């Protein structure tokens, strides 16, 4: 079970005047506005860790860090990144994290070449096991999403690790009320600003499972406000042809997790007993071609959203694992300062931004129709009304936005504006186009041709054009 240390994180901090006396700084793994993450080697033991160096600043909320520490120091599970130690100096906090070098979930799927339902089932089984452990210890993650699922090592049989506990919460009487998370993965009760429980994590696992089997999210709309309305309605589809080769057992599993009523939604314990997880109903048919294409299209890499969270210390994948003991990696970086504060990124809105490349289809070839196959557990809602959404800025203040548009989902093609497939209207019998929520896709894989910004279609003056957009939202009650 979890560690039994005192709740006051100050009792856990070790004071230091020079962190380099304890660790050898080897190379940078990543950086954010207030922190940098280094590959370090402990001088006494020779062990390798990821060291997150957080610069003390009036703009950085100590309460957020202490919440993260309070959660991380309580837990110890084979599928959860471990907080090993904490140091503090007059200028920095230092979080010593377990080194995770296997890369992100999506990256590994793209590298496989062959991918089946059974592969997805094994991933979700590990996630359910870890989240079940969190829930048993009174902890709700609240921000489960694919980019928070990393592989421990580059080996093919590596374990999945859950990271990023910045939004985690220790339950008080089993109920919480602060609305937070990532659009597209947030449960309906959170968006409805109702009190919620650990069931929100199970909803997120349902969304992740859906994505792993088709490459795009279950909820996508033209605007954030419409996206939120669709999530609150709890309505989604298993569209053809993307779901034609997926088993009914997998769809049933998803339906039980994407249950609108949190009281009827599967718990982690129930989900672990489902035949798709615990039985032999997950198919071994290769779904790589379709899923990989949709993942590359809908989850483009976005450098301006690459802010490191407490446990997300991976950027060196296979290169790091293969060279850990080579002379070039053992070379110290003694002259590098612990932190070089990066300027806060702003929302890109240049019309000249680069876009995700897409092949041009033969205009004489008709586009495949997307047949609507409603989930048997859902009823079709009326068209969602428009609305405004609250976008949380870096300093915590709120602004109103109604123009942000997620990426569009559908077969790759060139849009009517000539820029990208995101502008393409794909549907059947006048139905609106299908959109997906663009998500951070960190990857050092040179094989993939991802651009630095997520491109979204924006209607202006009767025409559609592309520009960069941000969808990360935290709703604060």
UniProtKB/Swiss-Prot annotation:
Chain spans, region Autoinhibitory domain = 277-317
This enzyme catalyses: L-seryl-[protein] + ATP = O-phospho-L-seryl-[protein] + ADP + H(+); L-threonyl-[protein] + ATP = O-phospho-L-threonyl-[protein] + ADP + H(+)
Q: Which residues form the Protein kinase domain?
A: 23-277
Look up the coiled coil feature and give its residue ranges. none
Q: In which tissues is it expressed?
A: Highly expressed in brain, in neuronal cell bodies of the central nucleus of amygdala and ventromedial hypothalamic nucleus. Also detected in heart, testis, and kidney.
Q: Where is the composition biased (Low complexity)?
A: 376-388
Q: Does the keyword Cell membrane apply?
A: yes
Instruction: Give the residue ranges for region: Disordered.
Output: 326-388
Enumerate the InterPro entries for this protein.
Kinase-like_dom_sf (IPR011009), Prot_kinase_dom (IPR000719), Protein_kinase_ATP_BS (IPR017441), Ser/Thr_kinase_AS (IPR008271)
Instruction: Kindly list the places in or outside the cell where this protein is found, as annotated in its UniProt entry.
Output: Cytoplasm; Golgi apparatus membrane; Cell membrane
Q: How is its activity regulated?
A: Activated by Ca(2+)/calmodulin. Binding of calmodulin is thought to result in a conformational change and leads to activation through phosphorylation by CAMKK1.
- Positions annotated as active site in the UniProt record: 143 (proton acceptor)
Name one molecular function that GO assigns to this entry: ATP binding
Q: Which organism is it from?
A: Mus musculus (Mouse)
According to UniProt, the name of this protein is: Calcium/calmodulin-dependent protein kinase type 1G
Q: How is it modified after translation?
A: May be prenylated on Cys-474.
Q: What is known of its domains?
A: The autoinhibitory domain overlaps with the calmodulin binding region and interacts in the inactive folded state with the catalytic domain as a pseudosubstrate.
Q: What is its EC number?
A: 2.7.11.17
Q: Kindly list the positions annotated as binding ATP.
A: 29-37, 52
| GO annotations of cellular component type | calcium- and calmodulin-dependent protein kinase complex; endomembrane system; Golgi membrane; plasma membrane
Q: Which family does it belong to?
A: Belongs to the protein kinase superfamily. CAMK Ser/Thr protein kinase family. CaMK subfamily.
Query: What does the UniProt function comment say about this protein?
Result: Calcium/calmodulin-dependent protein kinase belonging to a proposed calcium-triggered signaling cascade. In vitro phosphorylates transcription factor CREB1.
């Amino acid at each position: 079970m979890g560690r039994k240390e005192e709740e006051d994180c100050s009792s856990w901090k070790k004071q230091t005047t020079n962190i380099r006396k304890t660790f050898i700084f080897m190379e940078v793994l990543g950086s954010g506005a207030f922190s940098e993450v280094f590959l370090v080697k402990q001088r006494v033991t020779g062990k390798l860790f990821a060291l997150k160096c957080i610069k003390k600043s009036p703009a950085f909320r100590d309460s957020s860090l202490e919440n993260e520490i309070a959660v991380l120091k309580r837990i110890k599970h084979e599928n959860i990144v471990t907080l090993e130690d904490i140091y503090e100096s007059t200028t920095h906090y230092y979080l010593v994290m377990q080194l995770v070098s296997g890369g992100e979930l999506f990256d590994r799927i793209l590298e496989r070449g062959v991918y089946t339902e059974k592969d997805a089932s094994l991933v979700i089984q590990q996630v359910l096991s870890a989240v079940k452990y969190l829930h048993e210890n009174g902890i709700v993650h609240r921000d489960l999403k694919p980019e928070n699922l990393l592989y421990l090592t580059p080996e093919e049989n590596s374990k999945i690790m859950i990271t990023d506990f910045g939004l985690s919460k220790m339950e008080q009487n089993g109920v919480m009320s602060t609305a937070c998370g990532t659009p597209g993965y947030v449960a309906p009760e959170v968006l409805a600003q109702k009190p919620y429980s650990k069931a929100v994590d199970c909803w997120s696992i349902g969304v992740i499972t859906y994505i792993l089997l088709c490459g795009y999210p279950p909820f996508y709309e033209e605007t954030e406000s419409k996206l939120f309305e669709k999530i609150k309605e709890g309505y989604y589809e298993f569209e053809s042809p993307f779901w034609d080769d997926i088993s009914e057992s997998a769809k049933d599993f998803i339906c039980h997790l994407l249950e609108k009523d949190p009281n009827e939604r599967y718990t982690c314990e129930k989900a672990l007993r489902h035949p798709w997880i615990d039985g032999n109903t997950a198919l071994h048919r290769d779904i790589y071609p379709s899923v990989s294409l949709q993942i590359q299209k809908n989850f483009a890499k976005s450098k301006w959203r690459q802010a490191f969270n407490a446990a997300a210390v991976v950027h060196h994948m296979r290169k790091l694992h293969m060279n850990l003991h080579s002379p070039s990696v053992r070379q110290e970086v003694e002259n590098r300062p612990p932190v070089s504060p990066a300027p806060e990124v702003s929302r890109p809105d240049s019309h000249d931004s680069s876009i995700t490349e897409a092949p041009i289809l033969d205009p004489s070839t008709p586009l495949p129709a997307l047949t609507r196959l409603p989930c048997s557990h859902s009823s079709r809602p009326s068209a969602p009304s428009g609305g405004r959404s609250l976008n949380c800025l870096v300093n915590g203040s709120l602004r109103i936005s109604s123009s942000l548009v997620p990426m569009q989902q559908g077969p790759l093609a060139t849009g009517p504006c000539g820029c990208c497939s995101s502008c393409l209207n794909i549907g059947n019998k006048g139905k609106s186009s299908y959109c997906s929520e663009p998500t951070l896709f960190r990857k050092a894989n040179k094989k993939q041709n991802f651009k630095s910004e997520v491109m979204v279609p924006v209607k202006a003056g009767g025409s559609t054009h592309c520009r960069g957009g941000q969808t990360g939202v935290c709703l604060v009650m």
